[in-house]
Regions:
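Secreted/periplasmic carbohydrate-active enzymes, especially glycoside hydrolases
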Residues: 1-185
Length: 185
């Protein structure tokens, strides 16, 4: 960047003007203005997973059952500057560090990919909080050099709510208890 150099001071100005594209715009508690948490300067490659999708890392992973025993992860990845000569690789890694599945996709602004999951271990809250890791990488298709990567931990589970019987996780009725609490500072 022409504006930021290592070793120089960076001044930040905060604007607390209402913005309808950012939730929440109204609330039952006081909004504080300004910067009241740490600020980090992040250096990223030109071709990367987006960092500007409303606070997300630009990668959305949805587990779903396929047939009786099969599962798959549906992946949607948002890419900045996708016109580079790179590719994306998505790898499913189990809790022991073993690679279970992998796929490679051409780079474009929105990538859709699927990863099959054989013999899955289902996430089951406190009983079995088993998590897989989905390693998401952008790499140079010529040199194989990884230029951006994000590891996302995710669980495989299905749930539904019955208006008479309550909440079900992986086919088992679960009694939910909780509190209403928010953090504003």
């Amino acid at each position: 960047s022409d504006y930021i150099r290592y070793g120089c001071r960076v001044d930040i100005t905060a604007d607390n003007s209402p913005d309808e594209s950012v939730y929440p715009t109204m609330a039952d508690f006081t909004f504080y203005g300004g910067v009241y948490r740490d600020v980090n300067l992040i250096e990223v490659p030109d071709c990367r997973f987006t960092m500007n999708d409303y606070g997300s890392d630009g990668i959305y992973i949805t587990p779903r059952r396929v047939g009786e025993d099969g599962w798959e992860l549906s992946i949607k990845a948002l890419i900045d500057n996708a016109d580079c000569s790179h590719k994306a690789r998505f790898t499913l890694i189990d809790a022991d560090g073993n690679e279970k599945a992998s796929t490679i996709a051409d780079l474009r602004p929105i990538i859709s990919a699927k990863l099959p999951v054989e013999d899955p271990v289902l996430w089951n809250g406190r009983k079995n909080p088993y998590l897989y890791t989905v390693r998401c990488e952008i790499f140079d298709s010529t040199t194989e050099e990884v230029t951006d990567n994000i590891d996302i931990r995710t669980g495989l589970r299905e749930y539904h709510i019955d208006s008479h019987k309550g909440f079900f996780l992986n086919g088992e009725h679960i009694k939910l208890q909780g509190v209403s609490r928010h953090q504003d500072r």
